[in-house]
Curated annotation (Swiss-Prot):
Function: Ribosome preservation factor that protect a small pool of nontranslating, vacant ribosomes in cells under nutrient starvation conditions. Under nutrient-limiting conditions, cells reduce ribosome biogenesis and degrade ribosomes via autophagy (ribophagy) or proteasomal degradation. To avoid excessive degradation during starvation, STM1 binds to and protects 80S ribosomes from proteasomal degradation. Under nutrient-sufficient conditions, TORC1 phosphorylates and inhibits STM1 to prevent formation of dormant 80S ribosomes.
Subunit structure: Associates with mature 80S ribosomes. Binds to the head domain of the 40S ribosomal subunit and prevents mRNA binding by inserting its alpha-helix domain towards the mRNA entry tunnel at the decoding site, where it blocks the binding of tRNA and mRNA at the A- and P-sites. Interacts with eEF2; interaction sequesters eEF2 at the A-site of the ribosome, thereby blocking the interaction sites of the mRNA-tRNA complex, promoting ribosome stabilization and hibernation.
Recorded GO CC terms: cytoplasm; nucleus
Keywords: Coiled coil, Cytoplasm
Pfam family, any one: Stm1_N
PTM field: Phosphorylation by TORC1 upon nutrient replenishment inhibits STM1 and causes its release from dormant ribosomes.
Localization in the cell: Cytoplasm
Protein name per UniProt: Ribosome-associated protein STM1
Top-level lineage group: Eukaryota
Residue ranges with Acidic residues bias: 117-138
Amino acid sequence: MSFQNKNLYDLLGNDVEEDAAPSAPSREVVKKNTSSKKSDAAPASADPAKAKKKKSPTGNEAALKNKNFNKDVAPPQSTATKHSKKPFDRHSRTGKTDSKKKLQQGWGQSDKRELEGEVEGTEDAEAELEAEAEENDESANAIPKKSLQEYLAELELSKQELEGSKKLRQANEGAEQKWTAEEKIEKQQEVFFASTHTKKAKSKAQKEKVFLDIDANFGDEQPQTTRGGFRGGKRGGARGGSRGGAKRGGARGAAKPEVNDKNFPSL
């Protein structure tokens, strides 16, 4: 019985270090000049904007100061809409164009026609002017003449013709004879119950107005107290009132007017 060892990890192929080719050694660069001095190179060009240590303008201020810089910048463009029509929608895609001959046929080559029309128009205008001049000469030579008597006779004839043509309606023309006898028709009410007693209207005589002459006498009004009198009273006046108190019945009023029955007769 033979026995053979197998490396199962060898099947995975993870042993890269042994299979990889050995890397070549790096080449060492040897400089000819071993001095530590810097190479003689030209200095960088200085920026004049950074020399003053100021911030460069931006925005609208930069656009105003640096007008020449904006020439290199493209202007803003409007974005195309999503629903815009195609550029060939309003143009013919057949490739056919109207030639000069077709245009003259369609619209009419009116160069010769316009010239002929102008010539004919001038000829017609000249002929009309000649005809008008002849008519004016004839009318100027033949002036109508008429006497006063002939004119009055013509007026009378025209009046007679006008009066004869008018037909005036005469009075009562076309009246009917049946309406000559006029009758007044009154509506009478039927009496269902005749009353035996007739009501008599009472005649009431009007009363005459009686005017009375009266001598009216009115009592004088109470005397008014004067304004601005002394306030208070005399100092040291008697205390208390009179003995027995105030009189009964109060103060008397103004005198009543005398009434006589003779001045007021009974009605």
